Amino acid sequence: MAPLVRRSWSLRGHTPVLRQRGRALQKVSAIAAICIPPKRDQVALYFRLHADANVNTERAMDFLGHLQHQLHTPIVLVWDSFQAHKGELINECVLPRSAHLEYLPPYAPELNPVEYLWAYLKTNPLANDPAFDLHTLTHRARCATRSVQHRQDLLRGFLQHTGLSLRLA
């Protein structure tokens, strides 16, 4: 749970100290989707956090089921080449329900708008904010991500920064 330090301050001659917990490696894993509806009038962010767990194929499938339930429509899914996204369960269970599945090229995070979301969260609202327990870290990550859900300018910026032609309104 080591925080990203962007800026520090201390009196001249005194080294700044940022306290952090160093005994256990705890983390919050996340999965997210930035959705563009057919009307292209609003951009939506859906996410799930998993405290002290990895995002595996089962969790990715659960997230996709939740996403399809929320959207009430077949989706075109564009995913990175993360191994949990390429499991046979995904192809068997998700493809029949969704319209189309495409993968981004491997090692191309600059084409993935969700990567820009994570970078923004780590370097802005969550920077310089150490969490001393897993509950606090999860709460701060959830609050920071929810704050982005209502920022159309940021969500559109993440999409436009990829350079993909998405025809946003």
Residue ranges of predicted features:
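Extended, low-complexity cationic-aromatic segments
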Residues: 1-62, 166
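RNase H-like polynucleotidyl transferase catalytic core
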Residues: 14-22, 97-113, 129
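Short beta-strand segments
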Residues: 33, 76-80, 102-105, 138, ...
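Acidic, metal-coordinating catalytic cores used for nucleic-acid/nucleotide bond scission
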Residues: 53-55, 77-91, 106-111
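Short, basic/hydrophobic alpha-helical segments
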Residues: 57-76
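C-terminal anion-handling pockets and recognition modules
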Residues: 113-169
